[in-house]
């Protein structure tokens, strides 16, 4: 027993030694191969240079060299002096004109930056990409700065790869090399040195043969455990095992990963569920900024399950022609029954969703007898869980049940809502391709019972064929989302009282949380009110239109009902330091046409991008400055301060470097994030600091995002340089900006 315990303790240590030994050997081989490649490329380039040089020499020998004309006098050239070049040899004296260049003042130093027109969220940098050069003076004053800077990044510096760098290629080679060892060799340390040397020679002799052949069996778990212990930042043993499988799988050329769906326009298109067809669109589409793969919101909000209150254009349901499906017996009753079912079906609240991969079973091809996902609303094609249904005695259903990409439940309430009346004419036997069936399932969630519109979009099927295909799949297609039943209108006096109470609540919240502004994340707690457990309430934020709470939520901001310009505290949006929302503020002009230049609402400039023309030129105060081209009035919007959105921790790390440079572009956005315009930004980043500024900065909530607006503090004339208060302390202001601009009479 003692011997067994000793051996079990020695096993992991032995495997760690093997990992280290093989890793160092592979690294050395990689360096040798790299050196050989460099030598080979150097020799090849040198040979090409010699060949090219020889060709040029031959060309120069064949050319006629024309002598240079020698000037004898430059007296005819004004503003020049004569310069003579003499030689002790028999060469004639050469005379050339000498032109004097006047001294020109150098432009201020400018560090490289990338222009942006909107904020760009970036991840924290956990590795120091480069050690900044501060100059000898800074290092002499603070010799420990570089050491402290590296400690802030936990000692991780880009390029420091000693015994810590392992890429996919080395990882696969390392696992294959360790696969040569047997599990019974854990007690190698107990052998004599001569026996260990003989074993090592045998491994080296047969290593080339074993590495050239594919492994006979999957590597032992001990190998991945040992690698994980040596490289803990690369993942656990199970993660390394899965990574090895992915890297070593032999896939056919052009084969798609299991979670991918073939192109619907390609020859390999399959009949799949609506959720699978729209997976990429649902995953990449951001419903806050209406862009695909946006760079501002890392977590995409779940689409709202409630319909908008504005009216929608009704589709034309007249027959499209003499062969329209509506001429069939029972067709109109079938469509009317679908509409009635939609009205009486209660809406289902969705769950939250983040970016992710498809479920493993969703990659299998589906058949026409598969449950399509439940549509949630008409305002957006949302993704929902595809659901297979309950009990079905049909033999064909049982045979194809394993092929479904759906999971559980709602088919018990998604069975055929009505029984189809038998048609006089028999249905056409038309074959549907995978692309057509997939496209039908996508469109049915938007157009529902308008089969004429679906047929026009598909293009290869008539509305009658689409109708018959819909009848065939009626037992497995989920019903359309329920239409909201309008609540009875409140009395006018009660509505005004609620609105006044709401405005007072805005003022109280503004006064109580002026120093605590947190980033907004939409709340998503289905069937629960926004109480003390709601994330919006906890962060002291209003519920926005992106939240999943009810439209009657007491914490939801309803917008304003102003008739004027929304530039005084009489406007609830202006009072709450928000821009008017075009989806909520329908009377002030914020919802006017986007291309309209004359907008009555003056509280929507940031979201519309109504910035002024700015000019960049050297400043009389410090470095570069920004100047206004056209005059602006007091409180008029000038520009948005854009840059990288970074966390507070990342801002602290970057700020220590910026303080040494005595140049910082950090701007607090809220308690969670900071805008850094050092690397990326717009021209307003060059506006200098002043204790008597002509501009002021204001952080505003714009459609759920905090954004920084620069406004005129007074009337500014053409050509004036722009300044705003950086809110430095008195010592920092003298250290960073040593010159204060002269007072200007407004």
Swiss-Prot record:
Reaction equations catalysed: L-lysyl(27)-[histone H3] + 3 S-adenosyl-L-methionine = N(6),N(6),N(6)-trimethyl-L-lysyl(27)-[histone H3] + 3 S-adenosyl-L-homocysteine + 3 H(+)
Domain CXC: 503-605
Residue numbers bearing the Phosphoserine modification: 21, 76, 363, 366
Protein EC: 2.1.1.356
List of residues that carry Phosphothreonine: 339, 345, 367, 487
Domain spans labelled SET: 612-727
Any single Pfam family the record assigns to this protein: PRC2_HTH_1
Region (Interaction with DNMT1, DNMT3A and DNMT3B): 1-340
The entry's keywords: Biological rhythms, Chromatin regulator, Glycoprotein, Isopeptide bond, Methyltransferase, Nucleus, Phosphoprotein, Repressor, S-adenosyl-L-methionine, Transcription, Transcription regulation, Transferase, Ubl conjugation
Basic and acidic residues composition-biased segments: 196-222, 374-385
Cell compartment(s), UniProt: Nucleus
Record region (Disordered): 180-222, 340-426
GO MF term (any one): promoter-specific chromatin binding
Family named by the database record: Belongs to the class V-like SAM-binding methyltransferase superfamily. Histone-lysine methyltransferase family. EZ subfamily.
Subunit structure: Component of the PRC2/EED-EZH2 complex, which includes EED, EZH2, SUZ12, RBBP4 and RBBP7 and possibly AEBP2. The minimum components required for methyltransferase activity of the PRC2/EED-EZH2 complex are EED, EZH2 and SUZ12. The PRC2 complex may also interact with DNMT1, DNMT3A, DNMT3B and PHF1 via the EZH2 subunit and with SIRT1 via the SUZ12 subunit. Interacts with HDAC1 and HDAC2. Binds ATRX via the SET domain. Interacts with PRAME. Interacts with CDYL. Interacts with BMAL1, CLOCK and CRY1. Interacts with DNMT3L; the interaction is direct.
Name this polypeptide is given: Histone-lysine N-methyltransferase EZH2
Organism from which the protein derives: Macaca fascicularis
């Amino acid at each position: 027993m003692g011997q067994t315990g000793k051996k079990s303790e020695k096993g992991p240590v032995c495997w760690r030694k093997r990992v280290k030994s093989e890793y160092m050997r592979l690294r050395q081989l990689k360096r040798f191969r790299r050196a050989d490649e460099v030598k080979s490329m150097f020799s090849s380039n040198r040979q090409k240079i010699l060949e090219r040089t020889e060709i040029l020499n031959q060309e120069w020998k064949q050319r006629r060299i024309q002598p240079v004309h020698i000037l004898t006098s430059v007296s005819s050239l004004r503003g020049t002096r004569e310069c003579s070049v003499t030689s002790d040899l028999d060469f004639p004296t050469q005379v050339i004109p000498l032109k004097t260049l006047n001294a020109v003042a150098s432009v201020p130093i400018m560090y490289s930056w990338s222009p942006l027109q909107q904020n760009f969220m970036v991840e924290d940098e956990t590795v120091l990409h480069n050690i900044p050069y501060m100059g000898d003076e800074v290092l002499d004053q603070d010799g420990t700065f570089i050491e402290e800077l590296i400690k802030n990044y936990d000692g991780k510096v880009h390029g420091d790869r000693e015994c810590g760098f392992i890429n996919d290629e080395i990882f696969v080679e390392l696992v294959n090399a360790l696969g040569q060892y047997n599990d019974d060799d854990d007690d190698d340390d107990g052998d004599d040195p001569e026996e260990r040397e003989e074993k090592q020679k045998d491994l080296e002799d047969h290593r080339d043969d074993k590495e050239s052949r594919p492994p006979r069996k999957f590597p032992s778990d001990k190998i991945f455990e040992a690698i994980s212990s040596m490289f803990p930042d690369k993942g656990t043993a199970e993660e390394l095992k899965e990574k090895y499988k992915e890297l070593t799988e032999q896939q056919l050329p052009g084969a798609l990963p299991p979670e991918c769906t073939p192109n619907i326009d390609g020859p390999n298109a399959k009949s799949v569920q609506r959720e699978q067809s729209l997976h990429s669109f649902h995953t990449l589409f951001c419903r806050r900024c209406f862009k695909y793969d946006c760079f501002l919101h890392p977590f995409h909000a779940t689409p709202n399950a409630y319909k908008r209150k504005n009216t929608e254009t009704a589709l034309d349901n007249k027959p499209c022609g003499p062969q329209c499906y509506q001429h069939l017996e029972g067709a109109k009753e079938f469509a009317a029954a679908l509409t009635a079912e939609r009205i009486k079906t209660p809406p289902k609240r969705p769950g939250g969703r983040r970016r992710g991969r498809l479920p493993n079973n969703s990659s299998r091809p589906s058949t026409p007898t598969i449950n399509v996902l439940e549509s949630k609303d008409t305002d957006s094609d949302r993704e929902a869980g595809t659901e297979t249904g309950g009990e079905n005695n049909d033999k064909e259903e049982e045979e194809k049940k394993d092929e479904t990409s759906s999971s559980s439940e709602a088919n018990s309430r998604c069975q055929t809502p009505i029984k189809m009346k038998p048609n006089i004419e028999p249905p056409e036997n038309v074959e549907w391709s995978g692309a057509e069936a997939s496209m039908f399932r996508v469109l049915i969630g938007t157009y529902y019972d308008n089969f004429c519109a679906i047929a026009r979009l598909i293009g290869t099927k008539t509305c009658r064929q689409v109708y018959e295909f819909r009848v065939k799949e009626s037992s497995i297609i989920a019903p359309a989302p329920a239409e909201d039943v309008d609540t009875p209108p409140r009395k006018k006096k009660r509505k005004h009282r609620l609105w006044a109470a709401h405005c007072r609540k805005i003022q109280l919240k503004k006064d109580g949380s002026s120093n605590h502004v947190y980033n907004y994340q939409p709340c998503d707690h289905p069937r629960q009110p926004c109480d003390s457990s709601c994330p919006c309430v906890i962060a002291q934020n209003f519920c926005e239109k992106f939240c999943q709470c009810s439209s009657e939520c007491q914490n939801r901001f309803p917008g304003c009902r102003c008739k004027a310009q929304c530039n005084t505290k009489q406007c609830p949006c202006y009072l709450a330091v928000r821009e008017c929302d075009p989806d909520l503020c329908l009377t002030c002009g914020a919802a006017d046409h986007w291309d309209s230049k004359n907008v009555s609402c003056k509280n929507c400039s940031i979201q519309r991008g109504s910035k002024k023309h700015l000019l960049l030129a050297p400043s009389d105060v410090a470095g570069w400055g920004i100047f206004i081209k056209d005059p602006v009035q007091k409180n008029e919007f000038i520009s948005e301060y854009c840059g990288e959105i970074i966390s507070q921790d990342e801002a602290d790390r970057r700020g220590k470097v910026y303080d040494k440079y005595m140049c910082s572009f950090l701007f607090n956005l809220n308690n969670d994030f900071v805008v850094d315009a050092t690397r990326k930004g717009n021209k307003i980043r060059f506006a200098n600091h002043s204790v008597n500024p002509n501009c002021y900065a204001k952080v505003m909530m714009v459609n759920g995002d905090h954004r920084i607006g620069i406004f005129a503090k007074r009337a500014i004339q053409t050509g004036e340089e722009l300044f705003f208060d950086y809110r430095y302390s008195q010592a920092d202001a003298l250290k960073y900006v040593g010159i204060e601009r002269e007072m200007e009479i407004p």
